[in-house]
């Protein structure tokens, strides 16, 4: 599989990657709203922001599960490459740095790119974005994850619904399974049937299992009905 690693001229981490001498293609658009169609899959390396400014390496699939959008379209999910995300995440966990490595729930755009896209990020403040040592370690983990993708062993491709945005459950499940879209608890009450179907279909490898993380019984009916009708086994946590 031909994986295109890209950065943005509008992103500080992209500029740190550039200073380190990597020759990845550079786009001139915002990382949440751009067009790109080269390669079989895409990896965007960029900044991560959070109000807590906690140092972290993060990875996620893009998409807007709800009616509001940050780049891309509302209620629209990008195509997920679960094996690629999982291979890179496993490589990230081996980085020799005492900072958090975690899988985030699906969020932000772009959503309409015709290829699978994975976001790999470092955060959560300018000090981290400009830290050449840590950014370099992250880039090398990405390259190693891409190199090992085809040999990455996954028992299942798994969807996760519920739980927090920073999914420690996904980070645990990724030890055995490939992680597809994660729809956090913040979207469950407004989750449309269309987005549930997209979370199943917008994948290059069709998910076979779904984990429901602390979703109240009153909010499960539509979700479990659609999952069951698509022959996806359901595990309640």
Swiss-Prot record:
It catalyses: a D-aminoacyl-tRNA + H2O = a tRNA + a D-alpha-amino acid + H(+); glycyl-tRNA(Ala) + H2O = tRNA(Ala) + glycine + H(+). Its EC number is 3.1.1.96. Binds 2 Zn(2+) ions per subunit. Its cofactor is Zn(2+). Gene3D superfamilies: AF0625-like (3.40.630.50). Pfam families: tRNA_deacylase. Monomer. This is D-aminoacyl-tRNA deacylase.
